């Protein structure tokens, strides 16, 4: 979260909250309900908040998350006001990538897109090179996540490696 500019996670959250102060009351902000500063940020918003994540506070969530044999992830997209889930497939693995997909889905939902349109858009996503790229050679799995690596991306890569070991 660019700590070199803000000094701490609290400083980063305060800077984000300052951005919220400039949104119009009829605007919309999409926030990660899994973020430790979610409650603070949501309380600062004077507009509609669309929350995504695994938290019970999230309106946009993933259900029945699983991997496929092609290196992708499948899940049921839960949207507010919808009784049926929309099946989503993204071409990458890892909970962090599910969270990223949920963020995009929350934006799409906020803009009025249908679950089917969101699924179609997410299916077209292609992961960037050197971001959670999984390859296998001589029985060894390698996760190449060296593009602009930082502690959070390294943690996500290690969590993905642990997940691959269980699957």
Model-derived regions, located:
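Acidic, Mg2+-coordinating active-site environments of NTP-dependent enzymes
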Residues: 1-141, 166
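Active-site beta-alpha connecting loops in nucleotide-dependent enzymes
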Residues: 128-130, 146-167
């Amino acid at each position: 979260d660019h700590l070199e500019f803000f000094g701490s996670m609290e400083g980063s959250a305060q800077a984000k909250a300052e951005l919220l102060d400039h949104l119009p009351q009829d605007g919309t902000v999409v926030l990660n309900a899994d973020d430790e500063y979610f409650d603070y940020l949501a309380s600062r918003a004077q507009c509609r908040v669309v929350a995504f994540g695994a938290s019970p506070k999230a309106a946009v969530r993933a259900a029945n998350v699983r991997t496929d044999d092609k290196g992708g992830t499948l899940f049921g997209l839960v949207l507010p006001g919808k009784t049926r889930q929309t099946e989503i497939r993204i071409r990458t693995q890892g909970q962090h990538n599910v969270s990223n997909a949920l963020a995009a889905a929350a934006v799409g939902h906020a803009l009025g897109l249908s679950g089917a349109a969101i699924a179609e858009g997410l299916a077209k996503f292609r992961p960037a090179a050197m971001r959670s790229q999984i390859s296998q050679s001589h029985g060894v799995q390698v996760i190449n996540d060296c593009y602009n690596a930082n502690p959070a991306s390294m943690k996500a890569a290690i969590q993905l490696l642990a997940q691959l070991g269980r699957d």
